[in-house]
């Protein structure tokens, strides 16, 4: 199978086009320009708000003018993650895609099908005048991945739809009617620089090979957290020897489970062999604990050139203990919906910043607002006990399920008629923009669905090609059977 043969042709044509357009979160200017040019080319009414959200309108096909107005919605930014051995500049370089069996993936980077395949689907519908639909509005939001900025900034009156179809879900055959809310918690330690005494062995220890994944959609899988694994080893060494921590770096994005982390440390020269011995023991322990979920886990130890400066040992002790105590993973399962994670937390990144700051970013999610806040307060308490300064982000609301939704009824009936099996109606632990849309447009009737993606927010992201055509057929059938205006 070659890329030119992929079906539906229009969807994959536009997906390949937008893979050529750099679109990191908060840097979507080129994608906004692309959408404005697309609207002009097709003589479609196009407008852009102050945040950068783009709305392209398309009139109803003849005879469908009496249907309710549908908003198709996707976000235009993508998570930019790459393997350490890959040279790629997300600000300038296109995404290099390839076919692997029935899957489409990128070479060593995130694919951007989250949510590029939704964007491409909307463009294919806008460009094809043979598709039957009522009044249509295509909403393209900015910065979903790192702050839901576009959804927060959306103003009343920017769109006029009655129904919103969010195209940002990742399991074909599943229709989502609710999602978790979330909040970010950031802890900062201020450290002093100290000199490392003479006669110390310097080494770098690195955790890599983990799967990572989405901190909402994959948190229940029990995958390894590179920050937690690295900290376990550092804490072990600090308990055995006089440890100086010179550098620490782990994870990247608040909504991605960290795949890689490293630290550069120093211990007395006579402890050199013990470090290697203990790493071998620790590696065996980690492999035993995570053999099923993380078969490619690697811990690598290398000697380092001596450094003069390290983090003061008081801060190092408080940092390591806080990272050890900080929760990560599923905290509670839903008592209403079997199999749904209710509350979770992600220990996302540990970074050294200017002005002697070590910043730890975490994110908490829950379908219950009070439980979300309780989890954030738990994380705050851990880091405050260790002497860190903790701040919260703005947070975003969840989306409460409406099992009596009219468009849900249409979508469920359509799927059964097209494919002979029932679609699964579910809520999702990941955050979607839908909760924020309801704040501004409380009468919107919404569902979310999409083709099958795996490994999102990591270089393992891939899209199951046959599910794109099923998703396409389902979407077009829904558009043809939208309820009439009331």
Segments from the language model and where they lie:
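Acidic/His- and Gly-rich active-site-bordering loop/insert found
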Residues: 2-103
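Zn-dependent metallopeptidase/amidohydrolase metal-coordination segment
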Residues: 7-11, 335, 342-355, 363, ...
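Midchain, well-structured core segments that form catalytic/ion-binding scaffolds
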Residues: 22, 102-105, 145, 152-365
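His/Asp/Glu-rich mid-to-C-terminal helical/loop segments that flank catalytic regions of hydrolases
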Residues: 36, 157, 223-240, 269-272, ...
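Active-site metal-coordination/substrate-binding segment of hydrolases
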Residues: 64-146, 151-162, 202, 313-316, ...
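Short, conserved charged micro-motifs
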Residues: 65-66, 269-278, 369-375
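Acidic, glycine-rich active-site loops and adjacent beta-strand->loop/helix elements
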Residues: 76-78, 139-147, 169-172, 211, ...
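Substrate-recognition/cap regions that form aromatic- and gly/pro-loop-enriched pockets
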Residues: 340-430
